[in-house]
């Protein structure tokens, strides 16, 4: 009986079999906890679903964890800045509408 996805295919996606086991376990836990899936699945079990995601390349290991943390920090800061700019524009629009309403 051939397992799908095959171990050889999966080992092409990660640096070692130990990394594969850790990545698969973490992703399976995330899926069980309700994390959104990155694709449709053939399998019912979360462990096999995690392996399908690894095989497709949708889930990967970050070999530079500090770099990942920095990227997440930058993304959060960028989102915060965008929200602040949007709130500022909304407040300016409200103030302008009030001004226009008082002129009439």
Swiss-Prot record:
InterPro entries: DNA-dir_RNA_pol_omega, Pol_omega/Rpo6/RPB6, RPB6/omega-like_sf. Keywords: DNA-directed RNA polymerase, Nucleotidyltransferase, Transcription, Transferase. SMART domains: RNA_pol_Rpb6. It is an enzyme of class 2 (transferase). The keyword Transcription applies. Pfam families: RNA_pol_Rpb6 (PF01192). One of its GO terms (molecular function) is DNA binding. Residues 76-104 are annotated as: Disordered. GO terms for biological process: DNA-templated transcription. It catalyses: RNA(n) + a ribonucleoside 5'-triphosphate = RNA(n+1) + diphosphate. Its EC number is 2.7.7.6. GO terms for cellular component: DNA-directed RNA polymerase complex. NCBIfam families: rpoZ. Belongs to the RNA polymerase subunit omega family. The RNAP catalytic core consists of 2 alpha, 1 beta, 1 beta' and 1 omega subunit. When a sigma factor is associated with the core the holoenzyme is formed, which can initiate transcription. Promotes RNA polymerase assembly. Latches the N- and C-terminal regions of the beta' subunit thereby facilitating its interaction with the beta and alpha subunits. This is DNA-directed RNA polymerase subunit omega. The gene is rpoZ.
């Amino acid at each position: 009986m051939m397992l799908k996805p095959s171990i050889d295919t999966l080992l092409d996606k990660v640096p070692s079999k130990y990394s594969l086991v850790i990545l698969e376990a973490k992703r399976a836990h995330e899926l069980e906890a309700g994390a959104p899936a990155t694709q449709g699945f053939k399998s019912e079990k979360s462990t096999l679903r995690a392996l399908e995601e690894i095989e497709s390349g949708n889930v990967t290991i970050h070999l530079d964890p500090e770099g990942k943390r920095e990227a997440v920090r930058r993304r959060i800061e960028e989102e915060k800045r965008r929200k602040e700019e949007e709130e500022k524009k909304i407040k300016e629009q409200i103030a302008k509408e009030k001004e226009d309403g008082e002129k009439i």
